[in-house]
């Protein structure tokens, strides 16, 4: 394994990849350029601060790993790695999946409540229902970036259990809203607490798993969104059979709110603030996890907040390209999640049957998602699955738009939904896996999800009642943005390929000159040996 070091920047520049090196007076570090002296007989000065640390890590890696992958980190085939992964898969993934399941259940139940008579009973008129759908995303967007940082400050048990308690109680309380104003208030509150869940789960899993282990595990979690939509339809159907003094939509909120509150103890007592302190690991495994962090390119448990990392994410064009792509993707996802029962009702099905007709759609979506996740991790690629999912969704939208036959339109909904979760999840995984330090990744994901969730503000206004039964405007806008997301995904491929080519040029030049490959821990994904995934 090659030695690594940081370099001062001489006058002749041959590359523009940013690194950090100490100032001449020994003051606080500042960003400089990694460069190589072109003049013969002149050697660039070496700074051994990172060299010593990386040499220690190299020794640790040799001790810990029986085999290594291309990045020089312990392979998943390492016996201890397998033990740790197995326990995380058994204990953490179900908890994260259930949390996301409950979040989506309470987020999208307004669609089922509407089919069950919500607007009629609380006297919503005109576009008031659409406004109630939309305002949820106003606070959801604002609290998205907060979730990633609160996770680090408060720790998973406290942060996640508080959010679950609050949005469960709010969902339960929604059963007793009497008018438009009250529904607006509870939707705003619900958006605030649910907005922190998805980014927190994403960041937590990126701390626990290596990026090549990430997609399949996240598929289990993200598919919970698909299953929650199916389960929500079943709950709505069951609530329609209850004979009581309350309305069907009230029972939907009561049942789903109580389910969420019932799971709070599992998060308050089942998680630990630090992964290595988890109750299900033995002493040997806890020690291994502490050492394992040192071989992960994307997490340092001792990392402290610094504005430098925030700025690194903000000025990275790849952050914004991913965010804009997610806006187009989520515009369809959020729109369909809330309005699908209404769209199916417009195809001629009764309200009760429409609730049931959503169940097999989301079940198939979950299966497709799992298949894509397995192959995405296996071939270590993200972009082909985003492109394929966007194309599939576009074809489905075109079928629903182009036909007036109810059976054909219902078939188009199946095609449409097979892609809406794959492209959204892979987009976030792609950015997360290609972003290094914790706070840089937290900022990048915050920006990404701010744009993605912001699309909910638009989706709530493009599927309006006056456009029934075909919703031509809403579906046409969704189709246009899917095509736009395909374009932005291609842009990201170009950007990552260009960065990888620059890094390869640096490595080749170092090898040619017999020099160690430069490294700085503060710029993890900017380092030459960090290869971006496509």
Curated annotation (Swiss-Prot):
Record has Transport as a keyword: yes
InterPro entries in UniProt: MFS, MFS_trans_sf
Parts of the chain on the Cytoplasmic side: 152, 209-217, 272-323, 377-384, 432-444, 496-534
GO biological process annotation, one example: quinolinic acid transmembrane transport
Iron found in the keyword field: no
Matching Pfam families: MFS_1
Known function: Involved in the uptake of nicotinic acid.
Topology in membrane: Multi-pass membrane protein
Region (Disordered): 21-56
Subcellular location: Membrane
Protein name: High-affinity nicotinic acid transporter
UniProt crosslink position (Glycyl lysine isopeptide (Lys-Gly) (interchain with G-Cter in ubiquitin)): 283
Record GO terms (molecular function): carboxylic acid transmembrane transporter activity; transmembrane transporter activity
Residue numbers on the Extracellular membrane side: 1-130, 174-187, 239-250, 345-355, 406-410, 466-474
Key words of the record: Isopeptide bond, Membrane, Phosphoprotein, Transmembrane, Transmembrane helix, Transport, Ubl conjugation
Predominant location category: membrane
Phosphoserine carried by residues: 27
A GO cellular component annotation in the UniProt record: cell periphery
Homology family: Belongs to the major facilitator superfamily. Allantoate permease family.
Transmembrane segments: 131-151, 153-173, 188-208, 218-238, 251-271, 324-344, 356-376, 385-405, 411-431, 445-465, 475-495
């Amino acid at each position: 394994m090659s030695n690594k070091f940081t370099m001062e920047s001489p006058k002749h520049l041959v590359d523009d990849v940013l690194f950090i090196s100490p100032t001449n007076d020994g003051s606080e570090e500042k960003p400089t350029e990694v460069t190589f002296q072109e003049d013969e007989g002149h050697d660039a000065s070496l700074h051994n601060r990172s060299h010593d640390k990386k040499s220690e890590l190299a020794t640790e890696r040799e001790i810990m790993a029986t085999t290594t992958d291309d990045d020089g980190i312990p392979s998943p085939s390492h016996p201890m790695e397998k033990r740790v992964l197995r326990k995380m898969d058994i204990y953490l993934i179900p908890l994260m999946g259930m949390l996301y399941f409950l979040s989506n259940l309470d987020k999208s139940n307004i669609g089922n409540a509407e089919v069950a008579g919500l607007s009629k009973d609380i006297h919503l008129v005109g576009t008031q229902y659409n406004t109630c759908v939309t305002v949820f995303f106003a606070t959801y967007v604002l609290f998205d970036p907060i979730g990633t940082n609160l996770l680090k400050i408060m720790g998973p048990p406290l942060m996640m259990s508080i959010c679950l308690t609050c949005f469960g109680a709010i969902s339960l309380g929604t059963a007793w809203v009497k008018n438009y104003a009250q529904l607006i208030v509870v939707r705003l509150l619900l958006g605030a607490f649910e907005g922190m869940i998805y980014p927190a789960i994403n960041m937590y899993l990126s701390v626990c798993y290596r990026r090549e282990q990430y997609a399949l595990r996240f598929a289990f979690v993200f598919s919970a969104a698909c299953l929650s939509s199916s389960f929500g339809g079943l709950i709505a159907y069951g609530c329609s059979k209850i004979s009581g003094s309350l309305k069907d939509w009230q029972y939907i909120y009561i049942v789903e709110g109580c389910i969420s509150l019932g799971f709070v103890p599992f998060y308050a007592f089942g998680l630990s603030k630090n992964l290595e302190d988890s109750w299900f690991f033995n002493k040997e495994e806890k020690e291994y996890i502490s050492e394992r962090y040192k071989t992960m390119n994307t997490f340092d448990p001792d990392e402290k907040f610094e504005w430098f990392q925030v700025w690194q994410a903000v000025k990275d064009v790849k952050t914004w390209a991913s965010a804009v792509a997610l806006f187009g993707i989520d515009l369809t996802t959020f729109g369909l999640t809330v309005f699908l029962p209404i769209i199916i009702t417009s195809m001629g099905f009764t309200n009760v049957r429409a609730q049931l007709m959503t169940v097999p759609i989301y079940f198939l979506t979950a299966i497709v998602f799992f298949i894509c996740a397995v192959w995405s991790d296996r071939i270590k690629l993200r972009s082909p699955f985003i492109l394929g999912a966007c194309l599939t969704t576009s074809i489905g939208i075109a079928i629903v738009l182009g036909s007036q036959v109810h059976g054909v339109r219902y078939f188009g909904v199946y095609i449409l939904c097979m892609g809406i979760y794959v492209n959204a999840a892979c987009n976030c995984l792609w950015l997360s896996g290609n972003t290094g330090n914790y706070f840089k990744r937290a900022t990048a994901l915050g920006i990404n999800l701010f744009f993605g969730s912001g699309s909910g503000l638009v989706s709530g206004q493009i599927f309006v009642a006056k456009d029934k039964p075909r919703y031509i405007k809403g579906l046409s806008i969704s189709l246009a943005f899917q095509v736009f997301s395909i374009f932005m995904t291609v842009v990201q491929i170009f950007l990552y390929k260009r960065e990888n080519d620059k890094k390869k040029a640096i490595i080749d030049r170092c090898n040619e000159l017999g020099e160690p490959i430069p490294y700085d821990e503060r710029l993890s994904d900017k380092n030459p040996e960090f290869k971006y995934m496509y």
